[in-house]
Amino acid sequence: LDYLKALGINNLRVLVGADGKDGIPTKAEPALQVEAGVYNDTIFDGLDFFLSELDKRDMYAVLFLNNSWEWSGGYSQYLYWAGHGEVPMPNVAGWDAFSNYVAQYAKSEKAHHLFRDHITYVVNRVNRYTGKKYSEDPAIMSWQIGNEPRPFGEDNKKSFAAWIADCAALIKSMDSNHLVSIGSEGMAGCEGDLSLWTSIHADANVDYTTIHIWPNNWGWIDKKDIPGTIGQAIENTCFYIDMHVQEAFKINKPLVLEEFGLPRDSVKFTSNTSTVQRDRYYRAVFDIVEKHAAEKGVFQGCNFWAWGGFAEPQH
């Protein structure tokens, strides 16, 4: 935290905790919610301590509570607990099988009920280091419904929007001190429907809008020729930001670009791999952020995904 603070970073977007049993490849562990409504107190202790240390440094957290993707449990884990059968992990069963499975979430009342219980438990938790309820913790800037929540299908859009509204209302009913956000990618996370993104953010209990941008995942770059395609990725990024800025202006709500990223030059994770093109892309994004900041418009800030730190935990 001291390192990030020294760089001028004052806002961190953080997963509250993973869901489900440990030992599943590609899923974060150790989990916080090991069974529905059953928690690993050691992990909660870590979140308590993290928030207390943020507060000492005048830093703030956006805490997201759910996840469309399997790497923390999220949708698929709640569906499993709700009796929808084994989860077809995408790295084994393929993307189509996984996406068809999680498409059930939008209309699963039992899964929604389990998640509502989780929201209630977390928002009302008392931090053992500060003695404050999370609902009264100044280190929390925003509760976020999930990481990239999606409807996963045209037929699910209405149910998805109703679920978002229900979650936002639930949080506000327990906590009037903090902002509420959705965690949406933007149009890319709304079945390509920009009007759906606008409508879910227009809800009175949602305080600001969010977008994510992933040029590699969305096919905006050629991994075999990043230098030759990075220009188009930057152009697409500008267009994507602008279209959402216009929509946010219509509903008079701030916009935060809370995720963006690009692979290293040879699409490897090793620390000695160069980052020339990624540096170019990040500079372009930050230039856009600075431009909008100077104009004092609806585009209010950004995070990037992600920071892993220097520590290597024993587990």
PLM regions and their residue ranges:
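Active-site mouth of glycoside hydrolases
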Residues: L1-I221, T229-P254, F260-H315
